[in-house]
């Protein structure tokens, strides 16, 4: 998305242009703490708004079912090569439209309906596509779920091994949507080998940390690795499948197309190439380190203010605040922080007595605001703002003060200052 594109949009569809401008203003004026969100570079936005959106390109580079693919072949191959270099993978498929699509392709390649899969329970930090009963993965396969220890709120690898011996899964899944600690992929490899299972790592949340060396890389241990390309990787919304096994790579390629998708989104693949290129630069390693430092600063500040953190803190980009310590639900906390222009999300905590629509937790993450330039001191201030807001839930004066402090931070660290749509925002 460039100024020129926005000008065209404002001229041809001012109604939609106003909506996009409204969303731009919302992003500028809020502290974005949703752990799965980030702000892409202008270059990523530009690639997604390019003429590549016009091209159909079923198949793989140099193996297409349509003519005229010489340039999209080069763009897609660039994305593949950069993904392989970034993660140290022998094979990469950059076509999945999303992380869920990447996971489904792996399931199609490795499993038959009725096979057993084993992943983390959603309420403990897993993901819908890892066997939740409301997801197709929970309908097509027999599912066994593991969770965290009730004592440490961390993975208990001995318990996972015992469950795997009992259930004998064909596919063991590690990688999560709300787990704040380091994942020991070597221990999962040993468990998978013990029971003869394939091992899949879904690193959608931690991909940027893995790519930059701030989290162990699963590729030496896992048969297949899937991820999204946004979140900590700071690219466009999309998916990616990687493996070091050439034969499995061929199966995954077929499972993506024609197995689960038709034509790839070449404009998004080009944006993935941009993001992978950015992540290969030294600046990205610095950024990822700051993401972790900022998350730990926020977690420590909340802990000092009396809040309980699931597992006691964080090793990565996210944390879970257990709000039962202040007799508050996640739904209530989500609403309160939204009123002071902080965007977060309610989230279940391990062994949560509340429903998923209410929850006892609040999930917070540092990637987006780290992209805007905030550092440790600013994240400590964010911790104090959140604490002041939640601990004084009925005090309007405190709420107003918190809102002003949020505004001050947003003003100090502007977002996309070059972008603007010359149309009024809709009421």
From Swiss-Prot:
Sequence positions bearing N6-(pyridoxal phosphate)lysine: 231
Pathway: One-carbon metabolism; tetrahydrofolate interconversion; Amino-acid biosynthesis; glycine biosynthesis; glycine from L-serine: step 1/1
Keyword Lyase (UniProt): no
InterPro entries, A to Z: PyrdxlP-dep_Trfase, PyrdxlP-dep_Trfase_major, PyrdxlP-dep_Trfase_small, Ser_HO-MeTrfase, Ser_HO-MeTrfase-like, Ser_HO-MeTrfase_PLP_BS, SHMT-like_dom
Substrates-to-products reaction catalysed: (6R)-5,10-methylene-5,6,7,8-tetrahydrofolate + glycine + H2O = (6S)-5,6,7,8-tetrahydrofolate + L-serine
Cofactor: pyridoxal 5'-phosphate
Pfam families: SHMT (PF00464)
SUPFAM superfamilies, A to Z: PLP-dependent transferases
Record-listed (6S)-5,6,7,8-tetrahydrofolate binding positions: 122, 126-128, 247, 355-357
Residue numbers marked as site, Plays an important role in substrate specificity: 230
Keywords from the named record: Amino-acid biosynthesis, Cytoplasm, One-carbon metabolism, Pyridoxal phosphate, Transferase
Keyword Amino-acid biosynthesis: yes
Subcellular location: Cytoplasm
EC number: 2.1.2.1
Cellular component, GO annotation: cytosol
Quaternary structure annotation from Swiss-Prot or TrEMBL: Homodimer.
Family as reported in the entry's similarity comment: Belongs to the SHMT family.
Protein name per Swiss-Prot or TrEMBL: Serine hydroxymethyltransferase
Origin species: Crocosphaera subtropica (strain ATCC 51142 / BH68)
Gene name tied to this protein: glyA
